[in-house]
Structures are given as C-alpha cells and as structure tokens.
Amino acid sequence: MNSLSYLNHAQQAFPPPEQALIEPNGLLAVGGDLHPERLLNAYYNGIFPWFNLDDPILWWSPDPRAVFVPGNMKISRSLVKYLKKQNWTYTINHAFEAVTAGCAEPRAGQDGTWISSEIQQAYLSLHHQGHAHSLEVWQNNELIGGLYGLAIGQVFCGESMFHRTTNASKAAMIVLQQHLQRCGFKLIDAQVVNPHLDSLGAKSIKRDDFLRLLAHLRDGTVSLDSWRKSEVTIEL
C-alpha cells in the first residue's frame, strides 16, 4: 500500500521504500531531522532528502531510479574535444565546504536553492566522519565546478553538482566515475534522470532493481585510498 509516513525526532527507522507515493513520485516520509545517523540510514536503504526551504524535511525513493555504472559513462566526441583543450586540474576532498556552497548557489531559471545552511552543515558532519566526499575542478587555482555525495559500500550516492565554467560539472562527473571504477565501486546513484545526466548516459532502472543492487553492494569494500586527499586525472 502506498502511503506517506510521518517521522518524529526519536524515530530513526524509515518505512519500506516500496510504500512511497506514486504522485508525487517517490515521496515516502515527512519530518525527522538531518542527524548523520538518520542520513546514513536513509541512503543505506535507498532514500534521500529533498525539500524546499519553507517545507518540512521530505524523504524520497523515486521509481524509476537514475544510475550510472562506473566505466560506462557516455562522453560525446565534442565534449572530449572541448575538455582536451582545457588546462583543468581535478582533486578529491580538497574543498568540500566550497563545493557544497557552490552547489547551493542560485541557478538560472530557479527561484532559489534547496541546499540550505542546515543541509550544508549536515553533509559537512558526514564529511568529517568519512562518509561524504567531494570532487573539485580547478582552473588556475580557482574552483570552477564540482560535486559531492556519499559512499555507501560499493555505491556512490551523488547529491549535487555545480559549474561556473561551461562543462565543468560534466568533467567532474567523468572524473568521478573513472575514479570510482579504479577504486572498486560498482554503482553511482544519480537519483532522478535530468537532461544533464541523460547527456552523460544515465540509465533509468526500476526501484525494485535498484534496491536489490543496493542491498548487494552497500556492505561491499573498496580501496582504502578511495577518498584520500589527492589530485586525480581525467582519461579522454
């Protein structure tokens, strides 16, 4: 039965994702908080928060789900040609706070951002605990793009990305999936397909299939050096 659950601060357990509403697609629960334990529990079970600034906390598990398999990303010839001309550098976990702040910047066609200071602090706590990570794109020591998300076993749960220079967020996504493949990750959760992700080859799979993959991979192991502060390269 599809129904909406209401969480209180003491209730850590989420209802099964299969109970999420059909419309709006994937809305599962309302309320609770953004404590690290609750956030980790959510991602471990295929659930993520998304809500506007004036809304209560909303928890989602949409059907279908957007995913990438590291190593299978689609890169157009024109994008390869463009990126080969750029003298950009790429780093892991060098500027997590700056990346989340970049993702929170207002974008064209949007009234505002859902990434509030509360959201930024919640994911910063997860970063300090070793669960949330960032990838940065630099041009002449200036941050021009990046992304952040959570590592859950062999799954990377992407949260948000941004760019201040054309194609910088696409470059970040390409570098991320190449890095994840090298480190032993098997899946990237991209949540919901959009034109930007679709252009990179994101696939839509049924929620049930995603949850089965997640259950198989969420306790898997990856390289211990996966999230060491480092500079990484792009392979084109």
Swiss-Prot record:
Its Gene Ontology molecular function terms? leucyl-tRNA--protein transferase activity
Q: Does the keyword Plastid apply?
A: no
Q: Which residues form the signal peptide?
A: none
EC number(s) recorded for this UniProt protein: 2.3.2.6
One Gene Ontology cellular component annotation? cytoplasm
Give its localization: Cytoplasm
Q: Which GO terms describe its biological process?
A: protein catabolic process
Q: What class of enzyme is it?
A: transferase
Q: Which InterPro entries match?
A: Acyl_CoA_acyltransferase, Leu/Phe-tRNA_Trfase, Leu/Phe-tRNA_Trfase_C, Leu/Phe-tRNA_Trfase_N
Write out the similarity annotation: Belongs to the L/F-transferase family.
Per its database record, what is this protein's job?
Functions in the N-end rule pathway of protein degradation where it conjugates Leu, Phe and, less efficiently, Met from aminoacyl-tRNAs to the N-termini of proteins containing an N-terminal arginine or lysine.
Q: What is this protein called?
A: Leucyl/phenylalanyl-tRNA--protein transferase
Q: Which organism is it from?
A: Shewanella pealeana (strain ATCC 700345 / ANG-SQ1)
Q: Which gene encodes it?
A: aat
